[in-house]
Amino acid sequence: MSTKGQIIKGKPVADKISEELIKEVDLLVKEGINPKLTIVRVGARSDDLSYERGALKRCQNIGITTEVLELAEDITQEEYIDVLKRVNDDKNVNGILCFRPLPKHLNEEVIKYVIAPEKDVDCFSPINSAKVMEGDKSGFPPCTPTAVVEILKHYNVDLKGSKVTVLGRSMVVGKPVSMLLLSEHATVTICHSKTKNLSGVAAEADVLIAAIGRAKMVDESFVKDGAVVIDVGINVDEEGNLCGDVDTNAVLDKVSMITPVPAGVGSVTTSILAKHVVKACKLQNNK
């Protein structure tokens, strides 16, 4: 008789990070330093608003001051850059989160060079991207890939020498999470839509990270017995329900651990964002 895999939720991980941050922020506030995050959002996309609500709540619970700059959808490139420069120069702001993707008429390839790298808490700047690739811990890796690694560490998954397969090669999750896992001494394989025998390659992994953005694509043929599965996907299924890239019910009898969607990786991401704001604040104040 097979035993069902353990569903590993993000909340205990997020709570532990938050507890540590509350102590750190208390010490900073006692010295007259108030960590502050500014969110720069164009328009009002529902997924942006959903993440924003979670981020504001998390930061406020920790004691981080927050501000949201909601910009018109028809904002020009020049106007957007002016706003970003103003926030860069504001000494009271320690962290900046720019919601992406930006509308098509705004050129991210230009704008990403404008954000101050020392305030760039979700890895928009090429300088922080380069630090991720180099394994340089002084920068700010993207929050979601960092959340993936934090979850694995929290649940004592031994990454050293483990075969880890990442499904997806985006700069948002796939590539950066692969680099972060390499820094943890995992043996990493990156798969994508052109990978031959995709399920066969995935089924060799001790740890499988699904970040392809296709609802319930990963079934039991993708996982080996006892694998750990981290589901980064956020999709909507035919019934209109939120679901991940993994068909959890199909794989639950084979895996040892799996993150749910919702209540998995996403719930840790906002804690990482807060952690990066506090780190930025300390660096800017030589703490």
UniProtKB/Swiss-Prot annotation:
GO terms for molecular function: methenyltetrahydrofolate cyclohydrolase activity; methylenetetrahydrofolate dehydrogenase (NADP+) activity. Its EC number is 1.5.1.5, 3.5.4.9. Pathway: One-carbon metabolism; tetrahydrofolate interconversion. GO terms for cellular component: cytosol. It comes from the Bacteria. The keyword Transcription does not apply. NADP(+) binds at G168, R169, S170, S193, I234. Keywords: Amino-acid biosynthesis, Histidine biosynthesis, Hydrolase, Methionine biosynthesis, Multifunctional enzyme, NADP, One-carbon metabolism, Oxidoreductase, Purine biosynthesis. One of its GO terms (biological process) is purine nucleotide biosynthetic process. It catalyses: (6R)-5,10-methylene-5,6,7,8-tetrahydrofolate + NADP(+) = (6R)-5,10-methenyltetrahydrofolate + NADPH; (6R)-5,10-methenyltetrahydrofolate + H2O = (6R)-10-formyltetrahydrofolate + H(+). Catalyzes the oxidation of 5,10-methylenetetrahydrofolate to 5,10-methenyltetrahydrofolate and then the hydrolysis of 5,10-methenyltetrahydrofolate to 10-formyltetrahydrofolate. Belongs to the tetrahydrofolate dehydrogenase/cyclohydrolase family. Homodimer. This is Bifunctional protein FolD. The lineage of its organism: Bacteria, Bacillati, Bacillota, Clostridia, Peptostreptococcales. The gene is folD.
